[in-house]
């Protein structure tokens, strides 16, 4: 298993060239050298009394003589991530040299891991102006001819030297390898790790106490017996009034009151693992995670909190003394507050909680576990384009000035489409038509219609050549037809084909435009905007390292594509942006691109159709975050000089967690604002309204959903992805304010 687990993206290690002194010109001015004491091996004794005053070097990486080139088996520079890093191989192992903007928090979390008996990578903090730091930088400069990575390191006061854990991240497991790796012991370790994450409020792994999708990239399964090793840990302290503490209390009440029963929270974690690996660990796997979680909780509940607080303060003092690093002043009080919750749950249990039946605990249906034939490759993380149907007729009053709205959850009695994201959705004659998207890990080409009047889903029975399974495509309504363009398949192969669905005839047709004009290159998560009898395609991604900023127009009457010669302040290549028509121009905002798609944009541009010219405009207010594309819908009211326009957008993601706010962008003033959403008293009704309680999970934060707006001022969203893939319909009534 070890050989199968250790995955490195390329051959990491090359022969080390001779060192260069060129780094000296890129280093900060020399500072007085601080003598560094040799780190000693740290083994946590039963009675936790450790003197860390010498250095925060609690793991023994061993000495690395950066001047002795003979000891290196290889060194390789990588620009993966936002700052880049180096891999260094010696006889004693492989290590990572990197910058960490979170170095004090990461170091503190590793100390907590050791205290709780969890495995953590060996780590040492190296001062860049120390003798070791200077020698390290000069050595690494020899292979970094561009100086891009080494300059970043040299400008940091401290550098992180970390052991490379040989293994595989949890999200890379497949249906073949998962049964061998996800043993009872592994599941118990995952439970213990979740307890640690609850203590430090780290939602970026398995989100047992949060509503996001988590990040299985931050859980490594070591080749040494599938040992669970956390990576990229952090502490995010919260105020005492935050609902995180109450959610943890409720979770503990449920687990303690119903031992041996699968809780809804751990059932959701089980679903997330199924989603990524295609393998269902079953009820036994969930219960094993619960056992590991409670074992760590009980261990923490046995701590002498006064003594433990002194230990935490000594760690903090050591970080400050040795490396001038300071964790947040709220971190230690927050950790102690969480430990008191653990202590109270074990020693002063509350009355029993209701039965933890997964099926009754959440309004969200759990996805069907993937079969063994499910692809092991996850779909693209870039969400699909929004609905681009023509704007509906205006309601009796303008919605541009609305500050509040009511939301309601639509209860559907009959069978629903499978949960999905990155699908398309258009509104036609009062019905929502949903095509394609990713269902768990598989792109689909199924086609559903939802009748809002009857509250009923139906499969659309159609004739003709339907589009192949895809996600990230665009859908536009024109001339009694839905027009599908682009997208990508399971293997992230992008498309540039064009299909229509005739609503009256219920027929599909593949469109073959005339060859006179240039055809758009394959792409997904582009924007498709209807202006008169033309469809404008802007941007999109061809793959994670290739983004576009070109503008194509498809003229329906001529059945012809044209590449426009756009000039002016052209936006950077991007995907996932919102683009709408306003006064015969295209207004576009946001998106992301850059190497690997990690650059998020919060800029706005106007493309004047008459002159094919871009210019940038300034926006004000509270912007939506755009690490994942936004689902949006345009709205127009009035005519002539009194015409108003806005864009409504719900959800999205900051790259780590799905979001749950409703935004409005005023196209006249370029101002963004958040619209306060109020909850309906009953499902399917508006009724009287009450404020959403703090921590309320509905409407569930999400991304990758579709959004439509009807002529009465009601916005409807379907599906998307939160902590799980979703299959619900949520509505926002903009007239109930």
UniProtKB/Swiss-Prot annotation:
Superkingdom per UniProt: Eukaryota
Keyword Transmembrane: no
Catalytic activity, EC: 2.7.11.1
Low complexity: compositionally biased ranges: 358-397
Record carries keyword Repeat: yes
Protein name per its UniProtKB record: Actin-fragmin kinase
Region of interest: Disordered: 21-44, 347-397
Gene Ontology MF: a single term: ATP binding
Regulation: Inhibited by staurosporine.
Enzyme class name: transferase
InterPro entries reported for this sequence: Actin-fragmin_kin_cat_dom (IPR015275), Kelch-typ_b-propeller (IPR015915), Kelch_1 (IPR006652), Kinase-like_dom_sf (IPR011009), PI3/4_kinase_cat_sf (IPR036940)
Mapped Kelch repeat ranges: 431-480, 482-533, 534-584, 586-635, 646-693
One annotated Gene Ontology cellular component of this protein: cytoplasm
Binding site for ATP: 82, 98, 163, 165, 178-185, 232
Record-stated family: Belongs to the protein kinase superfamily. AFK protein kinase family.
Coarse class of the protein's main subcellular location: cytoplasm
Xref: Pfam families: Act-Frag_cataly, Kelch_1, Kelch_3, Kelch_KLHDC2_KLHL20_DRC7
Biological role: Has a role in the regulation of microfilament formation. Phosphorylates the actin-fragmin complex on threonine residues, in vitro.
UniProt subunit comment: Monomer.
């Amino acid at each position: 298993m070890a050989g199968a687990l250790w995955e490195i993206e390329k051959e990491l290690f090359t022969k080390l060239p001779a060192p260069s002194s060129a780094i000296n010109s890129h280093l900060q001015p020399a500072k007085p050298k601080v003598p560094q004491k040799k780190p000693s091996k740290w083994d946590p004794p039963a009675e936790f009394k450790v003197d860390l005053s010498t250095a925060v070097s609690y793991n023994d990486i061993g000495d690395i003589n950066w001047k002795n080139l003979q000891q290196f088996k290889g060194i390789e520079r990588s620009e993966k991530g936002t700052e880049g890093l180096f891999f260094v191989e010696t006889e004693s192992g492989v290590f990572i040299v990197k910058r960490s903007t979170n170095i004090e928090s990461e170091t503190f979390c590793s100390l907590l891991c050791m205290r709780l008996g969890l495995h953590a990578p060996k780590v040492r903090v190296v001062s860049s102006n120390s003798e070791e730091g200077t020698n390290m930088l000069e050595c690494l400069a020899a292979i970094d001819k561009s100086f891009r990575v080494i300059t970043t390191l040299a400008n940091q006061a401290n550098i992180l030297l970390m052991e490379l854990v040989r293994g595989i991240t949890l999200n890379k497991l497949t249906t073949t390898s998962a049964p061998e790796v996800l043993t009872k012991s592994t599941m118990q370790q995952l439970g213990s790790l979740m307890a640690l994450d609850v203590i430090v409020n780290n939602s970026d792994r398995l989100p047992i106490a949060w509503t996001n999708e988590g990040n299985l990239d931050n859980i490594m399964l070591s080749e040494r017996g599938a040992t669970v090793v956390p990576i990229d840990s952090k502490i995010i302290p919260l105020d005492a009034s935050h609902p995180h503490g109450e959610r943890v209390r409720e979770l503990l009440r449920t687990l303690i009151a119903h031992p041996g029963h699968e809780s809804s929270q751990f059932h959701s974690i089980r679903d997330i693992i199924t989603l990524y690996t295609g393998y269902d660990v079953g009820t036994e796997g969930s219960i094993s995670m619960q056992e590991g979680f409670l074992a760590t909780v009980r261990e923490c509940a046995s701590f002498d909190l006064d003594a433990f607080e002194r230990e935490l303060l000594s760690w903090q003092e050591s970080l400050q003394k040795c490396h001038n690093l300071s964790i947040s002043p709220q971190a230690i009080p927050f950790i102690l507050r969480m430990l008191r919750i653990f202590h109270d749950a074990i020693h002063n249990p509350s009355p029993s909680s209701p039965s933890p039946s997964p099926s009754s605990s959440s309004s969200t249906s759990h996805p069907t576990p993937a079969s063994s034939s499910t692809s092991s490759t996850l779909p693209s993380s870039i969400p699909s384009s929004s609905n681009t149907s023509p704007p509906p007729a205006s309601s009796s009053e303008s919605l541009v000035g609305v500050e509040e709205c009511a939301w309601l959850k639509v209860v559907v009695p009959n069978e629903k489409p499978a949960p999905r994201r990155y699908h398309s959705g258009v509104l036609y004659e009062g019905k929502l038509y949903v095509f394609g998207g990713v269902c768990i890990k598989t792109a689909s080409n199924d086609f559903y219609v939802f009748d809002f009047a009857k509250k009923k889903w139906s499969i659309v029975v159609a004739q003709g050549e339907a589009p192949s399974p895809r996600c990230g495509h665009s859908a536009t309504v024109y001339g009694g037809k839905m027009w599908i363009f682009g997208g990508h398949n399971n293997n992230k192969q992008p498309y540039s084909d064009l299909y229509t669905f005739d609503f009256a005839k219920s027929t599909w047709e593949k469109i073959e435009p005339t060859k006179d004009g240039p055809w758009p290159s394959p792409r997904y998560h582009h924007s498709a905007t209807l202006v008169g009898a033309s469809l404008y395609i802007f941007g999109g991604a061809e793959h994670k390292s290739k983004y576009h900023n070109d503008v194509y127009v498809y003229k329906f009457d001529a059945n012809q594509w044209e590449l426009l010669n756009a000039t002016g302040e052209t936006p950077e290549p991007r995907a996932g942006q919102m683009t709408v028509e306003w006064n015969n121009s295209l207004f576009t905002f946001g998106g992301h691109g850059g190497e690997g798609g990690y650059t998020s944009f919060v800029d706005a541009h106007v493309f004047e159709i008459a002159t094919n010219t871009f210019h940038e405009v300034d926006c004000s207010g509270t912007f939506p975050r755009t690490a994942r594309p936004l689902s949006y819908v345009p709205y127009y009211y009035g005519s002539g000089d009194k015409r108003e326009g806005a864009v409504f957008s719900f959800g999205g993601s900051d790259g780590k967690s799905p979001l749950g706010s409703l935004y409005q962008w005023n196209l006249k003033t370029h101002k963004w604002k958040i619209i306060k959403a109020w909850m309906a008293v009953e499902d399917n009704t508006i009724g009287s309204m009450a404020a959403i309680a703090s921590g309320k999970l509905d409407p569930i934060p999400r991304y990758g959903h579709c959004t439509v707006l009807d002529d009465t001022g009601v916005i409807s969203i379907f599906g998307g992805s939160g902590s799980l893939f979703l299959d619900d319909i949520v509505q926002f009534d903009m007239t109930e304010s």
